[in-house]
Amino acid sequence: MKKGFRGTGTVERVDFPNKGIAVTDDGDRVIVKNTIPGQKVEFVVNKVKHQRAEGRLMEVIEKSPLETEEPCPHFGMCGGCTYQTVPYEKQLDMKLTQVKKLISDAIGTEKESGYEFIGIHGSPKKSEYRNKMEFSFGDEYKDGPLALGMHKRGSFYDLVTVSDCQIVDEDFRTILKATLDYFSKNNIPYFHRATHKGYLRHLLVRKATKTGEIIVDLVTTTQTEGFNEEELLAGFRYALLTRHYDGRFKGVLHTQNDSVADVVKNEGTDVLYGDSYFYEELLGLKFKITPFSFFQTNSLGAEVLYETAREFILGDDKDSLNGKTVYDLYSGTGTIAQLMAPVCKEVVGVEIVEEAVCAAKENAALNGLDNCKF
């Protein structure tokens, strides 16, 4: 099979990370990403290495028997989600199979290596679960009207305005619409990747699931020809804060980024309203989060994960701290370390970034934890 070959195949399985294995009528196997087991797909081979072919998905000819769910209206065109047509329980089965294969490929099967595979825990929420989104400014087609959303599947340039995105709640959708309406009305140009001209780049939205606190960060270039930036940003702040939300605004920020790369990069941030941080709660502890700091994007799912880790530490003796010392390596701002602190004698967080260590100490003090060291 050569580069440029166009063919069809049925997806046999999907390996991590998101690599569908499509089998042709001749028995050849091709890696095709963004596919689902059981789909019949058309592909074009774009890479052949060590006799392994990889292809780009061109079309889903036949749906998989697994696809029984109604997706969000942007599914298929939006590059954000892959498995929305598959029932959640089946998605978990797919992930379980992928993880078991990774482990067995590395150290052998349960019987061979003596480990116990305890299964998979699902998220308490199956929709509107994300607490963070990074939307991009652009257009849905060349020279089209301003768009704000996610990249189209398979495209580096074109966007989809995801006004009905189902993995975030209504507050996210309200913020997206208010932002797009405001800048469209004022004819503000987005940053073109090809020409490196324009102002609008990204919109970062974070909302705490437990506290309901919201922070929005508008990321732009410093190219302000043709308008008064101070007046424009004041109007943006007003456009956001005068809408109705279930949560409450903690801060509105403006970050400058003149780098060529299409990533959110902080080259200076100003506070337009409120604070530059917000608080989220996990398992009864409180955490201070800034726009660019790492935090699990599914708060309720994170609680399931960390509660499971706590159970491992406690072992069979649920009523004893066991005098155990837990080491949190590459601890960052110490979220995991603090969540483990209530079930052990001492936690030691190890981190090379000095700013993260300072933040970890601050959060530990906020939660009154005296058995955490960073």
Language-model region placement:
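Short, acidic/hydrophobic/Gly-rich beta-strand patch recurrent on exposed beta strands
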Residues: 20-25, 149-152, 217-219, 360
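Short, aliphatic-rich beta-strand segments
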Residues: 205, 212-221, 286-290
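Rossmann-like S-adenosyl-L-methionine
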Residues: 1-7, 13-17, 223-374
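Short, conserved phosphate/pyrophosphate- and ester-handling motifs at nucleotide-, phospho-/glycolipid
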Residues: 38, 168, 298
